[in-house]
Structures are given as C-alpha cells and as structure tokens.
Amino acid sequence: MRKITVTLLLILLTFTIANSQKPVPRRQIAAQVKAEFLHAWRGYKKYAWGHDDLRPLSKTHHDWYAQPLLMTPVDALDTMVLMGLKNEAATTKRYIIDNLSFDKDIYVQNFEVTIRLLGGLLSAYQLTGDKRLLALAEDLGNRLQHVFNSPTGLPYRYVNLKTGKVRGQVSNPAETGTLLIEFGTLSKLTGKRVFYDKAKRALVETYNRRSPLGLVGTRINVETGAWTNTDSHISAEIDSYYEYLLKSWLLFGDADCMRMWLQSFAAINKYLADETKGTVPSELWYGHADMSTGRRTATTYGALDAFFPAVLALSGDLNRAKRLQASSMVMWMKHGVEPEEMDYRTGEVKSAGYPLRPEIVESTYYLYHYTKDP
C-alpha cells in the first residue's frame, strides 16, 4: 500500500463526494487533485531533489538509508504518466535513468524496497515502454533475491545491495508474503522464472506455518519457521499477506494462491470477524485473536485494516465489503479524520496519529466501482 501527499486531498474529495447530494463536477475535482500533486512535487523538487523524501515543515530532505535511492521520483513517475503530466514525467524518467544506481554498500529493508522501488520501476516501465526502467528493475531484483537464502525459504528482512549479505531473522507475514506481485511481474516481463518461484515459495512457506485454525501470527523466525508472536489479525505486519494471496491469484491465475486465499478467507471470517456492537455502532469489525486457540485478544481496528473492504469486494463478497466499509466510515466520521487505531467496542482512540494512509481511499474506490453507490 504507496503514499504521497495527494492522499489527503483524495480522501477529502472521496468523502465530499460520498456525502454530497449534488452531481459531482468530476473534471473540476480531477483538476484539484492534479494541482495538489503538482504542489507536492514542486516542493520536493525545490527542497529535496535527488533525495528520497521531502520534510515539508523544515524544507529539508530525508533519505531512508545512508545513500539516497530516489524513493519519491520512482514512486511518483507512474502517477505523472497517468495524470498526463508529460513534461514532469519525461524529466523524472531521465533523472532516474541517469542517476539511480543500486550498486551501494547499504542494507535496505526488502519489503519496503520491493513495494516502492521494484514496484515503481515495473509500473513505470509498463506505462512508458522504456526498457531502461526494466533493466533497473531486473538489477534490483537480482540484488534483493539474496533475502530468500534462508533455511526455510522465508526471506530475511534486510539485504546489502552491494554484497548480498542478509540480516533480520525475525520477520512477519506482511514482509514474507508481500512480494509475489512485484517479483512475479518481474518474471513475466524478463522471462526469468526464478523471481516468481522464490517469491511464491516465501508465500507458500508462510501459509504452511498457519495454525490448525488456519490463522497466521504476527512474527516469525525465518531461520527456524517458529512463530515468536501468535497474535492474529488483519492489521500491521499481517495485512498485505492476505491481500497478496488474493491478488496473486487474480493477477497470475495461480491455483495454489486461490486455494490458500479461500482457506485463509474462511479462517479470517470465522475467528477474526466481530459483530458485537459496542459504543461505536456498526455491523462488522475485524479484531485480534490467538492463532492457536481463536481466543479474542483485542478489539482494535485502524487505518491499516481499512484495506480489507477492497479485498472483500475483489473477492466477490460485497455484503461484507459494504458492512466493513461502513465501519471504516464510522471510524473516520467520529473525529473528522481516521485515527491510526481505535477500540471498536469502546470507541477509545488507541493511536491518534494520521500518517496519510490511503487504504480507506482504495476501499472506497472499489466499493464504488462494484456498486456505483455514492
């Protein structure tokens, strides 16, 4: 799930549309979104060009690691193409091709670099057709694939881009199982099966370590395959594992992913779904439970969980998708903006931050796409 400053405006526009009784001037709204994107992009270019991120308050730059990897330009290029910003896209593409190198003696987090840089380069290549972007993606994929060299096939968390050395043996399902879309796409575009096979094995090995109830935990040792935290949920550290089971089936037609998704989906709905109403009225939430016993361990739901209505809609379960989206809207409307996490039984906010999460926007899009209900 990738973030950019424009997320805030998208969210505001989304809920303006949802609550409006008048026809929505779509061209006007599209122009507003594009203008906000350009505002954010120009700020980045002015104060942080050549680095990973802009710190807007101090007007300084920030790099994720010891050396910059052009996170923002790579992340934003496909958005520029989709918005028809030809000049900005051409300038950004040229800068990436001329300046981005992965031959750096730095440790990077495989999960974050995969979803942002590898995914960004692949989508930019698919939209522009420039094979130099695919060459960069393949080079990155070759450097990242060392993470899969564990005794279990579950990936280590960190890899040195230059030496291939790895570290970080305690990981989580989101990081071990959220790789197949990017690595699989790299395989399809390069014709090199190794990327697909290694990422799929990591996904399968994560699934194979589910409990007899069909649930996975929060943290796992990639060298032993033993769980170090048995809390099960759809939130941070697990969330996109479930998303990639479904989307890998839909994207690649992989029958194993279909089987794993359907079994996991049944377990999620049996042990994590919660229809108990509390002080925050709603029909459906998804809470936490112990992966081995199914015992409820927490009744929290947050901004990261709000991806799940989109997954439910994509899976064909529009009934649950609409009910859970209504819960997400309750969480949003209670304070005018969603908290990072709240207790859905008491209404107590557990984490009040708001780091511009886009998950609820994606779910709103999918629900509207399938239902046409504003």
Which positions does each model-derived feature cover?
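Hydrophobic h-region of N-terminal signal peptides that target proteins for export
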Residues: 10-18
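Generic cytosolic/nucleocytoplasmic N-terminal low-complexity/intrinsically disordered segments
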Residues: 2, 18-21
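Sec-dependent signal peptide recognition
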Residues: 2-8
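Glycan-recognition and catalytic cores of secretory/periplasmic carbohydrate-active enzymes
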Residues: 20-374
